[in-house]
């Protein structure tokens, strides 16, 4: 498989896209308005002609794909993929997101056309794990959603033995042979199978190493990248501004902390395989009105502070009994109780 070309070379995408990137690119430091996120002027370090996208810029910005991390967390090697700095976040150059997404899309179709296999990797967060599993199952690919086990690629012989044991247990549990075992032995087999299912459920049919890895977070799952690089297995990764692009063969600069943008990008990558097989696509070729992104709840808590309430503490908002016990006292009663406590203290000191 071909490695990603150096940023100083001309790169061609699926849709006759040409990019000439300079290695000494500087990040624009002036703040940008929300309109800039949609209009997205082409950076000085890139020239894009006749761009045809797999997903619209409007949909990408709606998903928050252009929002990077705080500049304190950035990796300077990602400078070529950053459009500007706004407020407390970097802004990812979304035109480059589209460009490199096209490139990864074309590469995946070549892999699928040659009968290659794909492994999706995403071990961060319940929602990401569910997305990884759904897209992998849609394309009959392998997936890893639990902690990356060392040697999954480099020590494949040992992994194969574990897979053989796992599949043997599954076959045993589905057959009548299991009735020949005692109740205690059946419980032990079930426990062992459940443990194997947790780590090997997404790769139980894998007979050989995958031909390409797709990672949601190359920082969190860097061990998977290290193993893939040792074996020259190409890596496609959704890279935020804290990633190291030199470890990734097919980088997709995008916000990989947004469930919406992850859903969008993973959907496009899975569509590359589905489209080649003649199966219906989920994102590619569909109008924006038909692309439904998941709804996410705001992480901000409601401010319930009311200065008119004496002794109010938001900590006790949901604990009415404690809150009322403290606040229902009249000022006179509170003052009287304070004086009584003071007399007790003075009396104790005199004694």
Curated annotation (Swiss-Prot):
Name of the protein in question: Small ribosomal subunit protein uS2
| CDD domains in the cross-refs | RPS2
Q: Encoded by which gene? A: rpsB
Keyword annotations for this protein, in alphabetical order, are: Ribonucleoprotein, Ribosomal protein
| Gene Ontology biological-process entries | translation
Can you name the source organism?
Ureaplasma urealyticum serovar 10 (strain ATCC 33699 / Western)
Show the segment(s) annotated as Disordered.
302-351
Among PANTHER family, the record links this protein to: 30S RIBOSOMAL PROTEIN S2 PROKARYOTIC AND ORGANELLAR, SMALL RIBOSOMAL SUBUNIT PROTEIN US2M
Task: Spell out the InterPro entries in the cross-references.
Answer: Ribosomal_uS2, Ribosomal_uS2_bac/mit/plastid, Ribosomal_uS2_CS, Ribosomal_uS2_flav_dom_sf
Q: Name one Pfam family in it.
A: Ribosomal_S2
GO cellular component terms? cytosolic small ribosomal subunit
Biased segments, Basic and acidic residues type = 340-351
| First and last residue of the signal peptide | none
For this chain, the family text in UniProt reads: Belongs to the universal ribosomal protein uS2 family.
């Amino acid at each position: 498989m071909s490695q990603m070309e150096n940023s100083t070379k001309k790169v061609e995408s699926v849709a006759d896209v040409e990019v000439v990137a300079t290695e000494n690119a500087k990040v624009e430091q002036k703040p940008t308005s929300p309109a800039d996120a949609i209009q997205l002027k082409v950076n000085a370090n890139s020239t894009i002609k006749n761009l045809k996208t797999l997903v619209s810029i409007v949909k990408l910005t709606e998903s928050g794909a252009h929002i990077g991390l705080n500049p304190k967390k950035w990796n300077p090697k990602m400078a070529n993929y950053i459009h500007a700095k706004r407020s407390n976040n970097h802004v990812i150059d979304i035109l480059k997101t589209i460009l490199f997404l096209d490139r990864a899309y074309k590469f995946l179709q070549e892999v699928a056309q040659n009968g290659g296999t794909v492994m999706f990797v995403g071990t961060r967060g319940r929602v990401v794990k569910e997305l990884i599993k759904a897209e992998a199952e849609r394309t009959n690919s392998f997936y890893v959603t639990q902690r990356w086990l060392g040697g999954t690629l480099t020590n494949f012989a040992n992994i194969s033995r574990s897979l053989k044991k796992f599949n043997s247990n599954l076959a045993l549990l589905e057959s009548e042979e299991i009735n020949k075992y005692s109740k205690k032995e059946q419980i032990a087999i079930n426990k062992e199978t459940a443990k194997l299912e947790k780590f090997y459920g997404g790769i139980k049919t894998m007979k050989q190493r995958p031909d390409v890895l797709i990672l949601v977070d190359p920082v969190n799952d860097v061990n998977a990248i290290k193993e893939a690089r040792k074996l020259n297995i190409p890596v496609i990764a959704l890279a935020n501004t804290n990633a190291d692009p030199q470890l990734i063969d097919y980088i997709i600069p995008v916000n990989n902390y947004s469930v919406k943008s992850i859903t969008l990008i993973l959907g496009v990558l899975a569509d590359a395989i589905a489209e080649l097989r003649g199966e219906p696509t989920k994102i590619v070729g569909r109008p924006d009105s038909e692309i439904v992104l998941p709804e996410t709840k705001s992480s901000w808590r409601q401010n319930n502070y009311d200065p008119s309430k004496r002794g109010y503490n938001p900590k006790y908002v949901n604990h009415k009994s404690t809150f009322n016990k403290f606040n229902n006292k009249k000022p006179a009663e509170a003052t009287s109780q304070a004086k009584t406590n003071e007399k007790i203290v003075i009396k104790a000191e005199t004694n």
